[in-house]
């Protein structure tokens, strides 16, 4: 169960996501990584700006957190993401030894365009991972996070859809 502290950090992740704007077509994801009660990274999705297909909010935050700490491992850190991490970001969390992942909106809360892999559930990645010391929890400020994105039943033409 998420705590008031989790909600505080998730609200910060929402603010980071909103710094990209309010258009759900731009995939305004936000991510905050907290260690020992302090933010060590706060990033948003930057795939279009860089351009870099791996510049998801979680990937950027993990990079910044490792730079800030000077470490490859983020043991004891909690990663807060406004959207359920994709497979790439989930595996990066595992490999960087993040201790806990807390996300807001899940796959079923948003349009399928936000998830490239239609049959791969990141929760399955966690469950089958070689690490058993990572925790994952979804639904923290779910509704507020889901408002950032197109809804699951949004009628979008192909030109409007993109996995960003």
Regions found by a protein language model. Give the residues of each.
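Zinc-dependent deaminase
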Residues: 1-22, 94-164
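A short helix-loop-beta-strand connector motif used in the catalytic cores of GNAT acetyltransferases and
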Residues: 23-27
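Short beta-strand scaffold segments in enzyme catalytic cores
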Residues: 28-37
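Short beta->alpha transition motifs characteristic of CBS
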Residues: 40-47
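Glycine/small-residue-rich phosphate/adenosyl-binding loop
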Residues: 41, 58-67
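A short, polar/charged loop-to-alpha-helix boundary motif
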Residues: 49-60
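Immediate flanking context of iron-sulfur cluster ligation sites
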Residues: 71-83
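Local cysteine-cluster metal-coordination motifs and their immediate loop/turn environment
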Residues: 81-99
């Amino acid at each position: 169960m998420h705590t008031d502290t989790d909600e505080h950090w998730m609200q910060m992740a929402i603010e980071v996501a909103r710094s990209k704007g309010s258009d759900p077509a731009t995939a305004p994801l936000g991510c905050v990584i907290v260690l020992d009660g302090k933010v060590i990274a706060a990033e948003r999705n930057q795939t279009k700006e860089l351009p870099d297909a791996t510049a998801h909010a979680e990937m950027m935050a993990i990079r910044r957190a490792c730079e800030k700490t000077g470490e490859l491992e983020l043991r004891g850190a909690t990663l807060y993401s406004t959207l359920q991490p994709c497979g790439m970001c989930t595996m990066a969390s595992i490999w960087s030894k993040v201790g806990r992942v807390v996300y807001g909106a899940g796959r079923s809360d948003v349009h399928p365009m936000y998830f490239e892999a239609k049959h791969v559930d990141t929760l399955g990645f966690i469950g089958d991972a070689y690490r058993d010391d990572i925790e994952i929890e979804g639904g923290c400020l779910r509704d507020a996070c889901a408002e950032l994105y197109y809804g699951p039943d949004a009628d979008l033409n192909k030109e409007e859809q993109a996995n960003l």
